Structures are given as C-alpha cells and as structure tokens.
Swiss-Prot record:
Gene3D superfamilies: 2.40.10.170, Bovine Mitochondrial F1-atpase, Atp Synthase Beta Chain, Chain D, domain 3 (1.10.1140.10), P-loop containing nucleotide triphosphate hydrolases (3.40.50.300). Keywords: ATP synthesis, ATP-binding, Cell inner membrane, Cell membrane, CF(1), Hydrogen ion transport, Ion transport, Membrane, Nucleotide-binding, Translocase, Transport. The lineage of its organism: Bacteria, Pseudomonadati, Pseudomonadota, Alphaproteobacteria, Hyphomicrobiales. This is ATP synthase subunit beta. It is found in: Cell inner membrane. HAMAP family: ATP_synth_beta_bact. It is a peripheral membrane protein. ATP binds at residues 195-202. NCBIfam families: atpD (TIGR01039). It is an enzyme of class 7 (translocase). It catalyses: ATP + H2O + 4 H(+)(in) = ADP + phosphate + 5 H(+)(out). It comes from Brucella anthropi (strain ATCC 49188 / DSM 6882 / CCUG 24695 / JCM 21032 / LMG 3331 / NBRC 15819 / NCTC 12168 / Alc 37). Pfam families: ATP-synt_ab (PF00006), ATP-synt_ab_N (PF02874), ATP-synt_VA_C (PF22919). F-type ATPases have 2 components, CF(1) - the catalytic core - and CF(0) - the membrane proton channel. CF(1) has five subunits: alpha(3), beta(3), gamma(1), delta(1), epsilon(1). CF(0) has three main subunits: a(1), b(2) and c(9-12). The alpha and beta chains form an alternating ring which encloses part of the gamma chain. CF(1) is attached to CF(0) by a central stalk formed by the gamma and epsilon chains, while a peripheral stalk is formed by the delta and b chains. Residues 1-42 are annotated as: Disordered. The gene is atpD.
Length: 517
C-alpha cells in the first residue's frame, strides 16, 4: 500500500501545483508516492483499463501488464455523461483490481474504459471552500459554480508525528450550561455525542456551530455522513440565515460543508468523513483552530460494514467489519492538535437500540476526550438539551485544569442528582412523605438543578419561540453554586426551566408570582 503524504509534502505542492506533474508513463507510481496537491489536470496521465464486472457498488477493472494502479488510487470513468470515481480496494490477480464506486453504477457496462488518475481521491482545500457544499470527491453540489482553487489534497493522509502534536490542556467554552459545567470540551479534543434516534444530537451540533462561530470566530467543517438530506439542506440555509455563512460562499463565511447523505452508495458514505477531515487538516496546518463536526460517525462504521460485506470479508461481532477498530483508528488519529493549530472534533454517535455496548459506539468511546450522552428519559420530561448529567464525562473535569471552584460545584451537582436518582424507587413505592427532611430537601434541589440544566437554543428559536441564550462559564458556576447551597430554595421549580443565567430564573419567579396573584 502506498504511503500517504505528510502535510509538509502537501504544503509544498500547494505552492507549486505544476511541479507535481510526472512523465506520462510513470505517473501512477510517482504521483501516488508523492500524493501531492496537484491540479486535477495532472491526473489524466494514468493507465487505461476496462470494466470486467459490475455488482452494485463494486466494480472490477482489468489493466494491461505492469500498469496496475495502487491500492486507494482513484480511477475515473464516464458514466452517462457524468464523472464517476472508483477507489481501488483490492488486487485480485490477472491484472484485475476490485474498486468501490463513489456514486451510482447504473449505466456502466463491461468493456467500459477506466483511467487511473495516479492519485487517491483529491479534494479542494483552503478558504475558497468556506460557505460551499461539496461531495466526497470534491465536486460542488450547491449550484454556486466551481470552487475557485487549484489547491487539492489527498483524502488519505498519515496522522501527525508525535513531535508535531501539542499536549496543552485548554477548555473550549460552548455557552451551553450542562456541557461547560459537567463535561467541558477540550480545545483540540474529540467529543462524542451519544444518543438514540430523535433525542436532539443534530440540534445540539447546530447550536455548537452557531455558538463557536459567534463566540470564537473560528472556522468549522461539517461532514454530513449518511444522514437525512433534508437536515443537510436545513443546516445550509440556517447557516446563511444566522450569518455563519454567506450565500454562494466567499468572504465572511465560517464553515465548509461536505455531504455524503443517506441516499449515497456505501463508498461515498465511508469516505466523506475523510474528505471533510482533509479540509479541516488544511486549515489546521495553516495555523487555524478548527471545529470539525461529524453527523453521524455511526454511519461511517455502517458504510464500512456494507463495503466489507460487498468485498467478501468475513464479518466480525454483530455483523460489523473485521477491520472496525483499524478503520476508526485511522481516521480518529488524524484528528489532533499540532504545534501549528488544532482540530476540535464533535461527533454525533447514533446508538443502535440505545445499546452502548454495541461494537460501533463502543469502538468510538476509546478515542474520545469527552462524552455527551443524550438520554430519552430526560427528553421525555421536556428538558432540552437532553444531556444526561451523570452519564456524560470529560477528562477536562480536573481541578488542575478547570480550577477548584468549578470542580467542587460540578461534583456537588452530580452528587445531589445521584442521591435523587437512588431515592426515586422509594418515592415511586412509598411517596415523598416517607422521606426524611434532608432527603426531601435534596429532592427539591435536584428537581430545580434538573430544570436549570435546560436552556433555550438559538437554532431552536423557530420551534420554541424562546430566544436563544449563550451563558458565560462564570455565570453557570455561580448559578449552580447558589442552587447547591440552598440560596434559591424559596424559588418555585418552573422558574428554573428554560432560562439562561440565575438572574433570569429570579426574574421568571417574580413574573410567575405576579401572574398567580
């Protein structure tokens, strides 16, 4: 297998795209070794083969002696007037390669000509991608014209060397109370959003994009992996409405979008996360702090499982691919902070049948710095974001990183909620009257804390009618510290529901009292 280029090779080639052109005959070997950011024209120098078999998304191509393309090379063919890209997955013998199609194979016939590009799939990178939507092979799909850049980068790259990686610990303040207090995100870390269907993963991701663009002014890259096309379209238009992006891209846009949605073949869904990550890596290597969102990382695993079956590999546990850990590790190791810049990754992880022991979410756990677990029972109470304060974790919740006060308040909040959870069986059987006075007080405070963990979102304004709130970390700590100490025991429970700071809760309590009078 050819070794992927380091970012250094890429940067050099970006400066001189023309230099990457190789002699006609030796193009496949040379360009695949370099994997440089050549302009796409350089790709037209490779060997030509013929299609021998088409089975769904799997296409076999036969080449002449000595012209076999390398594993992971991109091959191109014309399918009913449109460009179809195939990625080499296996060498079968008799000069035949087995490839995975990045788009529909309807219309392909045996004997059809296929050209080796000599490179892996190359996608456009740089600021010209901001505000645009592209697909897995870097083609714009937003009907706003071509992406005006010659800089391209291979989607298969090596992870940064150990000496290039940074080890500083710093919090990324999101403005979402439950996240900042109980499971804070590391700048340059990997965060998993766990939850079943319909508990609010995508809404939380959209709120994070919105808050980070407003509060930090950083670039974001959003990879839509195997999710609903409607949601992708909604996200694009909401970004334009909220000012995160400008229509058609250009100056002022803060996010690049890379989509491979539910209706795409498994090849596109398995590679689109890498295409998005490649765009993010380019920003990082130029000194940016980038946010990389993946919705949904489970679909990446699911697509890999489909491909594995199509390629005839023996399935592993629960029918997943035998290379599940390898595939996940190859991608996750590239998401890291270097001495140049950082990639903070937020990955929505669908949990099949709400089972956290399923191999797909379980494999993802190993790579994460923080987990935000969304719980259906919390969503059923109408508390949004439906983040489980006891299940969500973060390695950043350490007094050496967040400070003694933040750590003490977070642990106190969790202990009150844990005590309430353990009392719920007694309450269900015997009722509140059988509890001691101390336990009654704990339950009352826990119910107020639960409601105070809710928060109106900017991106949900259209549904709720409540204006969104971005809460400062100091205000969050102050509010929960007072709640735990009993300073707000006199306020009614509804006053804490769907507010930002504690001052807003006090104001709401006054309004409720006035309405009752």
């Amino acid at each position: 297998m050819a070794k992927a280029a380091t970012p250094k090779t890429t940067a050099a080639a970006e400066a001189k795209p023309a230099a990457a052109k190789a002699p006609a005959k030796k193009a496949p070997a040379k360009t695949a070794a370099a994997k440089s950011d050549a302009a796409p024209k350089a790709a037209k120098t490779g060997a030509v083969g013929k299609i021998t078999q088409v089975i769904g998304a799997v296409v076999d191509v036969q080449f002449e002696d000595g012209q076999l393309p390398l594993i992971l090379n991109a091959l191109e063919t014309d399918n009913l007037g449109s460009r179809l890209v195939l990625e080499v997955a296996q060498h079968l013998g008799e000069n035949t390669v087995r490839t995975i199609a990045m788009d529909s194979t309807e219309g392909l016939v045996r004997g059809h000509e296929v050209r080796d590009t000599g490179n892996p799939i190359m996608v456009p990178v740089g600021e010209e991608t901001l505000g645009r939507i592209m697909n897995v092979i870097g083609e714009p799909v937003d009907e706003a014209g071509p992406i005006k850049t010659t800089a391209r980068r291979a989607i298969h790259q090596e992870a940064p060397e150990y000496i290039e990686q940074s080890t500083e610990a710093e919090i990324l303040v999101t403005g979402i109370k439950v996240v900042d207090l109980l499971a804070p995100y590391a700048k340059g870390g990997k965060i998993g959003l766990f939850g079943g269907a319909g508990v609010g993963k995508t809404v939380l991701i959209m709120e994070l994009i919105n808050n980070v663009a407003k509060a930090h002014g950083g670039y974001s890259v959003f990879a839509g992996v195997g999710e609903r096309t409607r949601e992708g379209n909604d996200l694009y238009h909401e970004m334009i409405e909220s000012g995160v992006n400008k229509l058609g891209g250009g100056e002022g846009s803060k996010a690049a979008l890379v989509y491979g949605q539910m209706n795409e073949p498994p090849g596109a869904r398995a590679r689109v996360a890498l295409s998005g990550l490649t765009v993010a890596e380019n920003f990082r290597d130029k000194g940016q702090d980038v946010l990389f969102f993946v919705d949904n990382i489970f679909r990446f695993t699911q697509a890999g499982s489909e491909l594995s079956a199509l390629l005839g590999r023996i399935p592993s546990a629960v029918g997943y691919q035998p290379t599940l850990a390898t595939d996940m590790g190859a991608m996750q190791e590239r998401i890291t902070t270097t001495t140049k810049g950082s990639i903070t990754s937020v990955q929505a992880i669908y949990v099949p049948a709400d089972d956290l022991t399923d191999p797909a979410p379980a494999t993802s756990f190993a790579h994460l710095d923080a987990t935000t677990t969304l719980n259906r029972s919390i969503a059923e109470k109408g508390i949004y974001p439906a983040v489980d304060p006891l299940e969500s974790t973060s390695r950043m919740l350490d007094p050496m990183i967040v400070g003694e006060e933040h750590y003490a308040v977070a642990r106190q909040v969790q202990s009150i909620l844990q005590r309430y959870k353990s009392l719920q069986d007694i309450i269900a059987i015997l009722g509140m009257d059988e509890l001691s006075e101390d336990d009654k007080l704990t339950v009352a405070r826990a119910r107020k804390i639960e409601r105070f963990l809710s928060q109106p979102f900017f991106v949900a304004e259209v549904f709720t009618g409540s204006p969104g709130k971005l809460v400062d970390l100091a205000d969050t700590i102050k509010g929960f510290k007072g709640l735990c100490a009993g300073e707000y025991d006199h306020l009614p429970e509804p006053a804490f529901y769907m507010v930002g700071s504690i001052e807003e809760a006090i104001e709401k309590a006054k309004k409720l009292a006035a309405e009752a009078a």
